[in-house]
């Protein structure tokens, strides 16, 4: 299957571990012509239009080579962040329904992702969702001491991690 974007046609298999893992999806390539949920295709187009998704030859943080690169830090407007949160909320709802309690965004780019996704999830599905994020450095003063920002997960909480890109899982390992 091919995914058409403004800057050319890219095989979905190329995007499988990048774009689709951004949404936290277990996506398998489908035969040519099979329907893709509209929001997934729209999300890829949105990333290209927002100049967030680049095509070329890139060395990722993990050391892997990739024919594309996604920089979530390039979402710079309120309307872009609103749409981004909606795409993430749709993907989470498709994969988990309402069977989660907390959205966790690892520092640093995951922080705004958790916030905009929590807002969008409430707007789209009516569920009040808590969010939390970690700090790379523990805070030792004020009311919010420690490594967490926002809600502090409790035993039994079901947590969904939202992140811009996952290639090796290193940031998941770095998060406690």
Where in this protein do the model-derived segments appear?
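PRPP-associated nucleotide enzymes
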Residues: 1-5, 9-176
């Amino acid at each position: 299957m091919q995914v058409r974007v403004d800057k050319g046609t890219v095989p979905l298999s190329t995007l499988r571990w990048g774009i689709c893992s951004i949404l936290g999806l277990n996506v398998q390539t489908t035969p040519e012509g099979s329907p893709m949920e509209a929001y997934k295709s729209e999300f890829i187009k949105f990333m290209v239009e927002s100049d967030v998704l680049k095509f070329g030859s890139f060395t990722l943080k993990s050391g892997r080579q990739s024919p594309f690169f996604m920089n979530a830090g390039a979402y710079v407007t309120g309307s872009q962040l609103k749409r981004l949160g909606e795409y993430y909320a749709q993907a989470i709802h498709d994969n988990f329904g309402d069977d989660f309690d907390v959205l966790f965004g690892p520092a640093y780019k995951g922080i705004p992702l958790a916030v905009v996704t929590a807002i969008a999830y409430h707007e789209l599905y009516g569920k009040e969702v808590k969010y939390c994020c970690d700090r790379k450095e523990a805070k030792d003063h004020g009311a919010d001491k420690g490594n967490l920002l926002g809600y502090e997960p409790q035993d039994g909480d079901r947590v969904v991690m939202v992140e811009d890109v996952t290639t090796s899982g290193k940031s998941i390992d770095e998060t406690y």
